Regions:
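Rossmann-fold NAD(P)-binding glycine/threonine-rich loop
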Residues: 2-29, 34-43
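A short glycine/serine-rich beta->alpha loop
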Residues: 25-28, 51-52, 91-93, 210-217
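Catalytic, metal-anchored helix/loop core of enzyme active sites in primary metabolism
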Residues: 54-59, 64-67, 82, 173-223
């Protein structure tokens, strides 16, 4: 029901209203962060009178796995293959690489935080050329290795600067954006391992030190 919860805003409100009218629960906790208590925590905070001001998160276990797997011996194309082989990505990994899944998750979190937002309102920056998304899946696999050298050169540069790639979803000042960011050492997102997810929640109460929720974010066992 991730698609339903991130569909047109009026449809999302209708789903929740219908559930209330019929006395049933509309549960979708695992839509974001697998088994992590993210949606319920936001609901509890708002229920207590708090207000969400900013969301900063890594919400794709697949993409985090890919960028954590990159090395001198494992180029981008191989890392994407490994994500698929290990069950982290969709059968068509372009769904993950496009960031569309992360956009849906951010929309859900923003809505649960009390904001009116639709998928098309979120700014997205692709790190894979659009041409690889437009063709067939076979075409994607055939041309993905063409990006390996570029990503390896950038990976080496980041390593020298003590930075790491993270695909970050952010909601701030009433606007949403997702994209690949260079994260410096010392930032909470820097040491995120494997396919883990992390969320930093800035609220009126948790303002100076945002609330942090972190843990496994992909895989059938936790979803």
């Amino acid at each position: 029901n991730k698609i339903a919860a991130s569909s047109d805003y009026d449809n999302y409100k209708m789903l929740k209203q219908t559930a209330r009218e019929r006395g049933v629960k509309f549960l979708f906790e695992t839509n974001v962060g697998a088994g992590l208590p993210i949606i319920s925590t936001i609901s509890d905070l708002r229920g207590s009178g708090d207000r969400v001001l900013k969301i900063e998160a890594v919400l794709s276990g697949t993409l985090n796995y890919v960028f954590n797997t990159l090395s001198a011996d494992i180029p981008l194309s191989r890392a994407v293959h490994l994500a698929q082989e290990n069950g982290y990505s969709e059968p068509d990994p372009r769904i993950d690489l496009s960031g569309k899944d992360v956009i849906r998750k951010l929309v859900i979190l923003a809505r649960e935080s009390g904001y009116r937002v639709n998928v098309e309102d979120v700014e997205s920056n692709l790190f894979i050329p659009q041409a690889l998304f437009d063709g067939s899946l076979d075409n994607f696999w055939a041309h993905l290795p063409e990006l390996d050298a570029q990503f390896e050169a950038e990976r080496q540069r980041l390593a020298c600067e003590n930075k790491r790639w993270r695909f970050v979803a952010e909601w701030a000042d009433g606007k949403g954006r997702v994209g690949l960011r260079e994260i410096s050492q010392g930032h909470p997102l820097y040491d995120l391992e494997g396919s883990n997810n992390i969320l930093l929640l800035t609220t009126e109460r948790y303002h100076e030190y945002p609330m942090l929720i972190q843990g496994y974010g992909a895989g059938a066992d936790v979803t």
